[in-house]
């Protein structure tokens, strides 16, 4: 029996699983969380055992990915044995806006701190508000109630992205203030090209990939067909989590 276990587990993998940090890190990864260098202990643990843990997770048909920016996350395959879900189109668009803000001069000017309201305003500024409202409700006519629902959806999207490790709350949990993690580059694979990153991200947002019901479905179908080619749009599955507001 012992020999069989040793055949399945390398000594280093056994050490990784026996490490006190493993249960916490494993739970976070399975929930869809991205682990960057700001999580010092957990990040160091993953860096030390990256190869062994990747082999471990491949048994569940998922991969342990270390992005070019350095953060870790699990990328499910179509046959994954770990539960997954898809980010909504608005959540993905909010993620793109966060990536844009991360690259913007305002990030340095504001010491890296943004608010939920700023994200909402930037989203309206960069995208067509009418199309955004239609994306949430095809019958939306631009009423105050429609705009209120959009604001609530934006807050929910930010809250979910926070739970995925893409932003970090600052101060009181109800302050609505946060910093943006490098893991938002899951939404900006295209900006790794030779083009100016800020202009590339701005172009992506203005193209309105999540603008209308038809384009939303076309984008979703395209993402599924090219699952292995994009850092986010082709790897958009995350663990289901309950909605909760950050503001």
Curated annotation (Swiss-Prot):
Q: Where is the composition biased (Acidic residues)?
A: 236-247
Alphabetically sorted, this entry's keywords are: Cell cycle, Cell division, Chromosome partition, Cytoplasm, DNA condensation
| Entry's localization field | Cytoplasm, Nucleoid
Indicate the segments annotated as coiled coil, or none if absent. Answer: none
May I have one GO cellular component term? Answer: cytoplasm
Q: Give one GO biological process term.
A: chromosome segregation
Any one Pfam family match given in the protein's UniProt record, by short name: MukE
This protein's superkingdom?
Answer: Bacteria
Which cysteine pairs are joined by S-S bonds?
none
Which portions of the sequence form the region Disordered?
213-247
- Which residue ranges have biased composition labelled Basic and acidic residues? 217-227
Q: How does it assemble?
A: Interacts, and probably forms a ternary complex, with MukF and MukB. The complex formation is stimulated by calcium or magnesium.
Q: What does this protein do?
A: Involved in chromosome condensation, segregation and cell cycle progression. May participate in facilitating chromosome segregation by condensation DNA from both sides of a centrally located replisome during cell division. Probably acts via its interaction with MukB and MukF.
Family membership: Belongs to the MukE family.
Q: What is this protein called?
A: Chromosome partition protein MukE
Q: Which gene encodes it?
A: mukE
């Amino acid at each position: 029996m012992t020999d069989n276990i040793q055949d399945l587990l390398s000594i280093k993998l056994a050490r990784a699983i026996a490490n006190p940090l493993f249960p916490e890190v494993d739970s976070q990864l399975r929930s869809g969380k991205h682990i960057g260098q700001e999580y010092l202990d957990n990040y160091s643990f993953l860096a030390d055992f990256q190869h062994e843990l990747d082999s471990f997770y491949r048994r569940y048909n998922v991969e342990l990915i270390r992005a070019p920016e350095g953060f870790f996350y699990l990328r499910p395959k179509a046959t994954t044995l770990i539960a997954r879900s898809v980010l909504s189109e608005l959540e993905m668009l909010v993620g793109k806006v966060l990536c844009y803000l991360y690259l913007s001069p305002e990030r340095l000017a504001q010491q890296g701190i943004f608010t939920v309201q700023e994200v909402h305003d930037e989203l309206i500024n960069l995208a067509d508000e009418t199309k955004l409202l239609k994306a949430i409700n095809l019958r939306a006519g631009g009423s105050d109630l429609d705009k209120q629902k959009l604001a609530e959806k934006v807050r929910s999207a930010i809250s979910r992205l926070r739970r995925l490790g893409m932003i970090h709350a600052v101060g009181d949990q109800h302050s609505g203030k946060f910093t943006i993690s490098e893991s938002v580059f899951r939404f900006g694979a295209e900006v790794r090209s030779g083009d100016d990153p800020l202009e590339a991200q701005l172009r992506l947002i203005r193209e309105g990939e999540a603008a209308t019901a038809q384009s939303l479905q076309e984008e979703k179908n395209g993402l599924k067909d090219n699952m292995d080619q994009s850092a986010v749009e082709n790897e958009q599955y995350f663990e289901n989590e309950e909605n909760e507001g950050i503001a």
